[in-house]
Curated annotation (Swiss-Prot):
Assembly with partners or alone: Interacts with CD320 (via LDL-receptor class A domains).
Protein's name according to its UniProt entry: Transcobalamin-2
PROSITE patterns listed in its UniProt record: COBALAMIN_BINDING
Cellular component annotations (GO), alphabetically ordered: external side of plasma membrane; extracellular space
Length: 430
């Protein structure tokens, strides 16, 4: 009895000191609508549209898609295994290169863990080796004195470390050290703004390493870096409640949910963030499958670290397709497209149906002549690679802005311009 009293006393003391990140419960119908938006994407099985994050998000949610999930994972396995085989032959594997490096391969490894799969075959060893080679190449690009940059970005670097850690694969201290150095020296700040999703991904990766006590010689730095990431995320909270922006908030919450903290207002911050997410869900802000897949876990009080010991027998509600709303005749709106950072400045107004995407506007402009653009597929949707014949160079990208200077938070396939808006495409460095 005395021991029980002592334990209760200790739990009371620690409970008073440490706060947990918990968000308010979201209405189950709103959550179900999110899951329903993923169902059509699970029917898209082409190599360009397969997205491991969709599978991971659904497996960490409170919902399931039945046989669709099995078929989707089967399609993922076939595609990645074929790409892996081609990478060792002389076949043209240009379409596979993005799949076998960085974020995409890391997400595929997370998808396998979400299905409770452990690596015990040569194919598994080759996948692990492929991702380790990617990190080695990125480490070399960063350089011994940290004067360079990853060939991709630190988000993919952190995600790759996380995926390997979840599979309980160790990495050399020098690889982990690059991520630690980046956290310690504010490398995730671009144009004066903290990249919250990059901070969060680094925090998740480092927390995984800490839990396994990997890279024990770096333990003090890892612990300090996790605290630094948490502090930066909390400081990034806007008055509206989100961290950075509404789309970086789910990953930020995943990181904050991984461990309690004291004296930083963690509980209050997470409640505010959860409230902002609720409002955004009611407004229909989450349409992109990648963003939805990052949001679903936290609505089920899960994070990517739950993939360390996944529960593949957990009861999940079966999703049914949403009933489509009757088609209404849309009004016609005007949208002006502007490009200033080009040899020949461009500005033209187009008339499109309300609800059209920015990509629809770009296609209309190109079909009309005098305007050209190029895109590349990614897990978050197509992104601009060239405008009016001008390709984005090294450490450059085509930024989307609502005039005069408001950056868009969505990509060309997701953003729906409003009547009278001017959308500027601006080439910027990062």
């Amino acid at each position: 009895m005395e021991l029980l009293k002592a334990l209760l006393l200790l739990s009371g003391v620690f409970g008073a000191l440490a706060e947990f990140c918990v968000i308010p419960r979201i209405d189950s119908q709103l959550v179900e609508k999110l899951g329903q938006r993923l169902l059509p994407w699970m029917d898209r099985l082409s190599s360009e549209q397969l997205n491991p994050s969709v599978f991971v998000g659904l497996r960490l949610s409170s919902m399931q898609a039945g046989t669709k999930e099995d078929l989707y994972l089967h399609s993922l396995k076939i595609h990645y295994q074929q790409c892996l085989l081609r990478s060792t032959s002389s076949d043209d594997n240009s379409s596979c290169q993005p799949k076998l490096s960085g974020g995409s391969l890391a997400l595929y490894l997370l998808a396998l863990r979400a299905n409770c799969e452990f690596f015990g075959s040569r194919k598994g060893d080759r996948l692990i080796s492929q991702l380790k080679w990617f990190l080695e190449d990125e480490k070399k690009a960063i350089g011994h004195n940290h004067e360079g940059h990853p060939n991709t970005n630190y988000y993919q670097y952190g995600l790759s470390i996380l995926a390997l850690c979840v599979h309980q694969k160790r990495l050399h201290d020098s690889v982990v050290g690059k991520l630690l150095y980046a956290v310690e020296h504010d490398y995730f700040t671009y144009q004066g703004h903290v990249s919250v999703d990059t901070e969060a991904m680094a925090g998740l990766a480092l927390t995984c390493l800490e839990r396994f006590n990997f890279n024990s010689d770096l333990r003090p730095r890892i612990t300090m870096a996790i605290e630094t990431v948490r502090e930066k995320i909390l400081k990034s909270q806007a008055p509206e409640g989100y961290f950075g922006n509404i789309y970086s908030t789910p990953l930020a919450l995943q990181m904050l949910m991984t461990s309690p903290a004291s004296g930083v207002g963690l509980g209050t911050a997470c409640i505010k963030a959860g409230t902002s997410l609720l409002l955004s869900l009611q407004d229909g802000a989450f349409q992109n499958p990648l963003m939805i897949s990052q949001l679903l876990p936290i609505l089920n009080h899960k994070t990517y670290l739950d993939l360390i010991f996944p529960d593949c027998q957990a009861s999940r509600v079966m999703l049914v397709p949403a009933v489509e709303d009757p088609v209404h005749i849309s009004e016609v709106i005007s949208v002006t497209l502007k490009v200033a950072s080009a040899l020949s400045p461009y500005e033209q107004t187009f008339f499109v149906f309300a609800g059209s995407s920015l990509e629809d506007v770009l296609k209309l402009a190109q079909d009309g002549g005098g305007f050209t653009y190029g895109t590349q597929a990614s897990l978050s949707g197509p992104y601009l690679t060239s405008v009016l014949g001008k390709d984005a160079g090294d450490r450059e990208y085509w930024q989307l802005l609502r005039a005069p200077d408001t950056p868009l938070l969505q990509g060309i396939a997701d953003y729906k311009p409003q009547d009278g808006e001017t959308i500027e495409l601006r080439l910027v460095r990062w």
